[in-house]
């Protein structure tokens, strides 16, 4: 992913550096996501187990949806139910399944834990304040995770506005402007009702957003909090997202204190 580009300059450099870890496996097992074609050519010294969405591999997976929009997975011909509409969560389940089954655990055991899993704080955790639905995805952010979080927000059914509150995506180096502009284009395409941005880099995001009824940039956290506290309405669905250094969880907690 594009996380930590500042230290590595390119996704290819990140791949090269992280891929080097496989050289130290010796007799270990490498679990490789074959949905990412860039990973298929990595040299691995130990055993290789492959998994991936829509990929020819040891644990091939497909995604379907239940009547309520929840994700259903077919992994190596096994049906796995989830209670989530979060595509990122589903992709993690595919990886976890490959590891769990090859280590000798049973599918039924895995299914039970998937259905009872609750995301930790800051990791697409769902909170409720009166009739408002909150997605707390404040732990960290890059372009890919922001896009996934917005898609997750848009998967929620029912009345109410779809709102995002975005803080800077940090550690992107020279790619920061481009990455933040791409996020703005995603916001434009997503049929959002409101976008609130904060942070120096988010100026690039805010500047390219088109067609969103409310598109507001803030350089003052207090002003943003005050506006949200006064303007949120019943049945709103609101996503908070930003890099660790932006401490977006503080904005969330202040809005709903």
Give, region by region, the residue ranges found by the protein language model.
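Short acidic-hydrophobic, aromatic-tinged amphipathic segments that line or gate anion-handling sites
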Residues: 215-224
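A short acidic, helix-capping loop that chelates divalent metal ions and anchors anionic groups
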Residues: 2-8, 135, 169-174, 240
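Acidic, Mg2+-coordinating active-site environments of NTP-dependent enzymes
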Residues: 1-134, 159-160, 185-188, 192-194, ...
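Short SAM/SAH-binding signature in class I
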Residues: 95, 233-241
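ATP-dependent carboxylate/acyl-activation modules
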Residues: 121-123, 245, 249-251
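Short beta-strand segments
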Residues: 33, 165-167, 241
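Active-site beta-alpha connecting loops in nucleotide-dependent enzymes
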Residues: 119-120, 138, 142-211, 217
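Short amphipathic alpha-helix with an adjacent loop that forms part of the alpha/beta core around
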Residues: 225-231
């Amino acid at each position: 992913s594009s996380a930590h580009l500042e230290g590595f300059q390119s996704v290819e450099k990140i791949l090269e550096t992280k891929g080097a870890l496989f050289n130290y496996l010796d007799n270990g097992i490498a679990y490789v996501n074959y949905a990412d074609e860039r990973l298929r050519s990595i040299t691995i010294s130990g055993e290789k187990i492959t998994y991936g969405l829509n990929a020819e591999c040891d644990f091939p997976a497909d995604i379907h949806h239940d009547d309520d929009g929840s994700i259903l997975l077919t992994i190596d011909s096994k049906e796995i139910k989830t209670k989530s509409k979060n595509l990122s969560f589903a992709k993690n389940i595919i990886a976890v399944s490959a590891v769990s089954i090859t280590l000798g655990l049973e599918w039924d055991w895995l299914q039970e834990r998937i259905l009872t899993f609750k995301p930790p704080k800051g990791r697409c955790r769902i909170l409720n304040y009166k009739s408002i639905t909150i997605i707390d995805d404040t732990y960290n952010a890059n372009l890919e995770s922001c896009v996934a979080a917005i898609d997750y927000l848009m998967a929620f059914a029912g009345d109410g506005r779809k709102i995002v509150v975005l803080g800077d995506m940090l550690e992107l180096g020279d790619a920061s402007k481009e990455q933040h502009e791409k996020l703005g284009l995603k916001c434009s395409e997503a049929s959002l009702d409101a976008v609130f941005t904060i942070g120096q880099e988010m100026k690039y995001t805010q500047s390219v957003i088109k067609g969103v009824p409310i598109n507001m940039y803030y350089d003052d956290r207090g002003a943003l909090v005050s506006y949200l506290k006064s303007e949120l309405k019943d049945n709103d669905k609101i996503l908070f997202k930003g890099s660790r250094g932006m401490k977006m969880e503080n904005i969330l907690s202040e809005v709903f204190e």
